[in-house]
Amino acid sequence: MMSGLLSKKDIRSNLSNISGWVFEDNKIKRVIQFDTYMASIDVVNAIAKKAEQVNHHPEIIVSYCKILIELTSHDLGGVTTDCFEMATYINSITNDIKK
């Protein structure tokens, strides 16, 4: 995957289509709460597997029953359509998780 940087206007428009994400520090970010620590680890593992497949790797911080995900293009230094594709994937695998 590789796409060009999005403008702030495009980022705001894309954010309106996915729930839970914010634009901050030139990244899109989301915090997700879980009922158990292992549920959070299961999601991190699923994200890691997808990230390897598409070569777009988020920053992930794991806390007890909570993860912080930050998406940006490390190569381009900002948010791209790849970031939003990954965010959409993350939302799809966390829809059924109690937050």
What residues fall within each predicted segment?
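Charge-rich alpha-helical segments
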Residues: M1-K99
